[in-house]
Regions:
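RNase H-like nuclease fold core
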Residues: 16, 20, 25-117, 121, ...
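DNA-recognition alpha helix
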Residues: 2-15
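Amphipathic alpha-helical transducer elements in NTP-driven molecular machines
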Residues: 3, 20, 24, 66, ...
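Acidic/histidine-rich catalytic cores and adjacent linkers
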Residues: 132, 165-286
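Residues that mediate protein self-association or partner binding, especially
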Residues: 10-13, 27, 231
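Metal-dependent catalytic core segments for phosphate chemistry
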Residues: 12, 69, 138
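Conserved beta-strand -> loop -> alpha-helix junction used to position metal-binding or nucleic-acid-contacting
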Residues: 114-121, 126-164
Length: 286
């Protein structure tokens, strides 16, 4: 959002007149605060880190193109959530994620116990090269959505119910049987919807190694999707942004408002933390 845009919006919406110089001072303060936030020290250990992206239209070399703001949300040892940072990129790649993870490490992160991503290109291999102890889980809800792209509308409800049997199974062995059942029922009609389950099976079923309470935290995406939805709410008036800095500034302000409500640990935290300590006793610093 340019200075003139802010000036016009303040006048039209809030009926407030601010000079160009006053707005420039305010925006410079926001830029400085955003930079300090992005570079702040982080905790040495995060129990879970979710990674996802939200797409915006941004002007780049005279053209308006899609760019993604990638967000990392960490689960701290006190049960609170924290947005670790944001990074703007045109596309995902191993080198891009190497930069993100190097940034987190430089800011103090020594270990991530579990990562949960939308099968982001290059991320799984990169996290394994930097932190081979981390468990990497592909987000199940994103997997369901991706599979449904290949399914016609009238079959989606039934197909989704059959997929639900996979991730609601009591263990990986039963889940594999449910995947076989899904394939037998639908492979003639929707082979590509099932192929992605087969190709990503090991990374889709990491959560079966953990107790039910931790599983639910891993495979649900309500957290990251709610975050993205709230960011959209704050940015819905902008059809496009003039620069990467403008996007980052707007998303930063949105995140600051959202995080004000992140004041309570996630549900059943005492039980869940005890489970983490039993499983990862040598990697958790109390």
């Amino acid at each position: 959002m340019s200075v003139s845009d802010i000036e016009e919006e303040m006048r039209e919406i809030y009926e407030i007149e601010l000079s160009t110089s006053a707005i420039s001072i305010i925006t410079n303060k926001v830029n400085q605060a955003a930079q300090e936030w992005q570079n702040r020290p982080l905790d040495p250990v995060y129990l879970i880190v979710w990674m996802d992206g939200i797409v915006f239209k941004v002007r780049d070399n005279g053209k308006i193109i899609n760019k993604t703001v990638y967000l990392c949300v960490g689960l701290k040892q006190n049960g609170l959530k924290e947005v670790l940072g944001m990074w703007v990129g045109k596309s995902e790649s191993s080198s891009f994620w190497m930069g993100v993870l190097t940034d987190l490490k430089a800011r103090g992160v020594q270990d991530i116990l579990i990562t949960c991503t939308d099968n982001l290109n290059g991320f799984t291999d990169t996290i394994r090269s930097i932190s081979p102890q981390s468990s990497t889980q592909i987000c199940v809800v994103h997997q369901i959505r991706n599979s449904c792209k290949y399914v016609v509308y009238k079959d989606k409800k039934e197909f989704t119910a059959d997929m639900k049997n996979i991730y609601n199974a009591p263990n990986k062995e039963v889940a594999a049987i449910e995947l076989d059942n899904l394939e037998k029922k639908w492979r003639e009609k929707y082979p590509y919807a099932i192929l992605s389950w087969r190709n990503n099976w090991d990374d889709l079923t990491v959560f079966f190694h953990f107790p039910l309470e931790i599983r639910k935290i891993i495979y649900t995406t309500n957290l990251i999707e709610n975050l993205n939805g709230k960011i959209r709410k704050y940015t819905k008036s902008k059809l496009s942004f003039p620069s990467d800095d403008a996007v980052k500034k707007t998303v930063y302000l949105s995140l600051m408002e959202i995080e004000k409500k992140w004041t309570m640990p996630i549900s059943n935290w005492g039980l869940i933390m005890n489970q983490f300590m039993l499983i990862f006793e040598n990697r958790i610093q109390i």
